[in-house]
């Protein structure tokens, strides 16, 4: 457990609730004190949905602490069973209520006896995993539960569909542009002549999970959620899975070639033919997607060699790093992720595309790294957007966690060929172009009386006299912050507290030496 005013990945119960509320006709009971029950408000605010969030808080109060939780939890489960008639009720504690060390599995067993719905306890260690790991585990638990139930009831149908088909695993509520990505993936698979068997958990019914093994393969677009489910299905039913994220021209082509390889295992036997997707890749890359053309244009060449910093979840940070370095010629000075549990995979993906790698879930480390590198643009989460505003560095948001402006009403996928256009726009518009800042200052676009200091520290031990301040204001805006910082660094090294014009020139000479 960690006390912080900003966390990249939330507590474990949020991940469980995100998965439960993504399914249709599934209700979640959260055994929690007041204060932990903010999920309903958060989801209602951020997701563009008309349905109520199917989550009920079973509040731990003084009466519960005095008498125990069993009666209240069981009553809440049976009440929701009668009111909502869900297919499944998921009970989850929070990290706070886990301190009580109650036998919640016993509560679930008791409630199951008087409920028509299936009732399960989310099998998650709330002290060891974060939101994303818990979501991955909960999805796998629900899929396993219903496939084992179907096996016991002899309802499991293992015969493949007549035409090539896929399950898309890992699209769920509050995901970064997940709804748009889902539409783009459906369009991509449709273009390839592949049917969608199931999409889980978003919009799926748990009663249909027994049909998952009918698909020819599973597609897992995000590493954070869905990989455990895909591994389980591979182990139990021999279902192949593809976990290459189709983001960026290169990885989309790789993903489609992997799909072709999987489809061609069965198509000669069941359909009497083989598929060739190379003409589709060629047409989309050259004529449909604008990104490949844009990367060769003079506009994109203006970005060559510019420095960028990337930070986000493992999937998006790795993909954006490769797009910037390989497809747009932008130098990635540092790339990082807050998914510490996926560090090995992340390092393997990005090691040849950036100068340094940062694995941390501490936003202050990220802020200090950005202040040190002084990139031309940042590509990160909502927190990097805040850091960018403080440092006067533009930021494009490419990963969760995000706020309301990154749940757009318009169509904004990051995956697929349309996603390449969106990413190219985002990257190009995030950089300050040419002499834009300087021209704005010349023509009075900005108030130039005060100098913007790019620093996250709150040190106030240095003072600038009026002459040095005037000299600093004469320097063009796009290099002024750097000169100010270098001068202050020189002053501290030489124990100078008052900065004059002479100190500025001495700092310049020292730097040039």
UniProtKB/Swiss-Prot annotation:
One Pfam family hit: Oxidored_nitro
Instruction: Identify the keywords attached in UniProt to this record, alphabetized.
Output: 4Fe-4S, ATP-binding, Chlorophyll biosynthesis, Chloroplast, Iron, Iron-sulfur, Metal-binding, Nucleotide-binding, Oxidoreductase, Photosynthesis, Plastid
Cofactor annotation: [4Fe-4S] cluster
* Similarity annotation: Belongs to the ChlB/BchB/BchZ family.
The record's listing under InterPro entries reads: ChlB/BchB/BchZ, LI-POR_suB-like_C, Nase/OxRdtase_comp1, P-CP_red_C, Protochl_reductB, Protochlorophyllide_Rdtase
Q: Which gene encodes it?
A: chlB
Q: What residues sit in the active site?
A: 299
| Annotated source species | Marchantia polymorpha (Common liverwort)
- According to the lineage, what is the superkingdom? Eukaryota
GO function term, MF aspect, one: oxidoreductase activity, acting on the CH-CH group of donors, iron-sulfur protein as acceptor
UniProt protein name: Light-independent protochlorophyllide reductase subunit B
Role noted for this protein: Component of the dark-operative protochlorophyllide reductase (DPOR) that uses Mg-ATP and reduced ferredoxin to reduce ring D of protochlorophyllide (Pchlide) to form chlorophyllide a (Chlide). This reaction is light-independent. The NB-protein (ChlN-ChlB) is the catalytic component of the complex.
Q: Which GO terms describe its cellular component?
A: chloroplast
- Known EC number(s)? 1.3.7.7
Subunit composition? Protochlorophyllide reductase is composed of three subunits; ChlL, ChlN and ChlB. Forms a heterotetramer of two ChlB and two ChlN subunits.
Q: Where in the cell is it found?
A: Plastid, Chloroplast
Q: Which residues bind [4Fe-4S] cluster?
A: 36
Source species taxonomy: Eukaryota, Viridiplantae, Streptophyta, Embryophyta, Marchantiophyta
Q: How is the cofactor bound?
A: Binds 1 [4Fe-4S] cluster per heterodimer. The cluster is bound at the heterodimer interface by residues from both subunits.
What biological processes does GO assign it? light-independent chlorophyll biosynthetic process; photosynthesis, dark reaction
- Binding of substrate occurs at 434-435
The transmembrane residues are none
Which pathway does this polypeptide act in?
Porphyrin-containing compound metabolism; chlorophyll biosynthesis (light-independent)
Catalytic activity field: chlorophyllide a + oxidized 2[4Fe-4S]-[ferredoxin] + 2 ADP + 2 phosphate = protochlorophyllide a + reduced 2[4Fe-4S]-[ferredoxin] + 2 ATP + 2 H2O
């Amino acid at each position: 457990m960690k006390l912080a005013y900003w966390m990249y990945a939330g507590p474990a119960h949020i991940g469980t609730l995100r998965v439960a509320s993504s399914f249709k006709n599934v209700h979640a009971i959260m055994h929690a004190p007041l204060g932990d029950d903010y999920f309903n408000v958060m989801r209602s605010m951020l997701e563009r949905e008309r349905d109520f969030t199917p989550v009920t808080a079973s509040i731990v109060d003084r009466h519960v602490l005095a008498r125990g939780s069993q009666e209240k939890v069981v009553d809440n489960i049976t009440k929701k069973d009668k009111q909502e008639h869900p297919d499944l009720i998921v009970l989850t504690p929070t990290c706070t209520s886990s301190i009580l060390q109650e036998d919640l599995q016993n509560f679930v067993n008791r409630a199951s006896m008087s409920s028509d719905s299936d009732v399960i306890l989310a099998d998650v260690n709330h002290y060891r995993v974060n939101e994303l790991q818990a979501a991955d585990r909960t999805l796998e638990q629900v899929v396993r539960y219903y496939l084992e139930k179907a096996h016991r009831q002899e309802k499991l149908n293992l015969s493949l569909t007549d035409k090539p088909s896929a399950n898309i695993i890992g699209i769920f509520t509050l995901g970064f542009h997940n709804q748009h990505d889902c539409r783009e993936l459906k369009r991509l698979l449709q273009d390839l002549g592949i049917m969608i068997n199931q999409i889980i958990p978003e919009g799926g019914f748990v009663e249909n999970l027994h049909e998952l093994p009918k698909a020819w393969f599973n597609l897992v677009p995000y590493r954070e959620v869905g990989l455990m489910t895909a591994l389980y299905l591979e182990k139990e039913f021999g279902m192949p899975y593809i976990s290459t994220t189709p983001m960026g021209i290169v990885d989309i082509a790789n993903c489609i070639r992997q799909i072709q390889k999987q489809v061609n295992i069965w198509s000669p036997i069941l359909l009497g033919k083989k598929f060739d997707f190379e003409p589709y890749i060629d047409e989309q890359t050259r004529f449909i997607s604008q990104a490949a053309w844009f990367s060769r244009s003079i506009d994109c060449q203006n970005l060559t060699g510019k420095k960028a910093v990337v930070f986000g979840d493992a999937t998006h940070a790795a993909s954006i790093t490769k797009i910037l370095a390989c497809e747009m010629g932008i130098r990635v000075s540092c790339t990082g992720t807050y998914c510490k549990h996926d560090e090995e995979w992340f390092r393997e993906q990005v090691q040849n595309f950036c100068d340094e790698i940062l694995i941390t879930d501490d936003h202050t480390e990220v802020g200090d790294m950005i202040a040190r590198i002084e990139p031309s643009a940042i590509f990160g989460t909502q927190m990097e957007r805040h850091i960018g505003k403080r440092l006067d560095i533009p930021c494009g948001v490419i990963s969760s966690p995000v706020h309301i402006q990154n749940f757009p009403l318009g169509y904004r996928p990051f995956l697929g060929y349309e996603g390449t256009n969106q990413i190219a726009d985002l990257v190009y518009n995030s950089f300050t172009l040419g002499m834009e800042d300087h021209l704005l200052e010349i023509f009075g676009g900005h108030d130039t009386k005060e100098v913007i200091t790019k620093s996250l520290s709150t040190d106030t031990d240095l003072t600038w006299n009026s002459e040095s301040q005037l000299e600093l204001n004469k320097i063009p805006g796009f290099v002024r912050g750097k000169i100010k910082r270098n001068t202050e660094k020189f002053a501290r090294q030489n124990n100078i507290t008052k900065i004059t014009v002479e100190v500025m020139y001495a700092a310049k000479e020292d730097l040039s030496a």
